[in-house]
Amino acid sequence: MKRRSVCVGDTVYVLAGNDKGKQGKVLSCLREKNKVVVEGINVRTKNIKRSQENPKGKRISIEAPIHVSNVRLSIEGAPAKISVKVTEKGRELWNKFPDGTSKLYRFVKERKG
């Protein structure tokens, strides 16, 4: 993600897929793949083979990553439009409202490297 507006701990709204319309908390960001893992969203069942620790085997549910373009930040329970402004201090994320006004949402520090 070159410009990331979604960080770990943010609440996001799912725009597309089987879980469209649901909200969840971001558990991790996979920057190199432009994907995020969201709590309770895109849950997949994985079968664990039998072993000495698990003589019967078992099935576990895990959250699979979804593309960052399929989620949007959720502010006050609704998906929010975010714009990025570059200032002397760094990048600022602004929440844009339908009436044309905007409000500072978060300041993003520049990553080195």
From Swiss-Prot:
- Name the Gene Ontology molecular function terms of this record: rRNA binding; structural constituent of ribosome
BP-aspect Gene Ontology terms: translation
Q: Which Pfam families match?
A: KOW (PF00467), ribosomal_L24 (PF17136)
GO CC entries: ribonucleoprotein complex; ribosome
Q: Which Gene3D superfamilies match?
A: 2.30.30.30
- Cited InterPro entries: KOW, Rib_uL2_dom2, Ribosomal_uL24, Ribosomal_uL24_CS, Ribosomal_uL24_KOW, Translation_prot_SH3-like_sf
**Assigned keywords, A-Z:** Ribonucleoprotein, Ribosomal protein, RNA-binding, rRNA-binding
PROSITE patterns given for it?
Answer: RIBOSOMAL_L24
**Does the entry feature the keyword Magnesium, yes or no?**
no
Task: Describe the task this protein carries out.
Answer: One of two assembly initiator proteins, it binds directly to the 5'-end of the 23S rRNA, where it nucleates assembly of the 50S subunit.
Which PANTHER family does the record associate with it? MITOCHONDRIAL RIBOSOMAL PROTEIN L24
Q: How does it assemble?
A: Part of the 50S ribosomal subunit.
Please give the family membership noted in the entry. Answer: Belongs to the universal ribosomal protein uL24 family.
Q: What NCBIfam families does the database record attribute to this sequence? A: rplX_bact
Protein name, per record:
Large ribosomal subunit protein uL24
Lineage, broadest ranks: Bacteria, Pseudomonadati, Chlamydiota, Chlamydiia, Chlamydiales
Gene name, per UniProt, is rplX
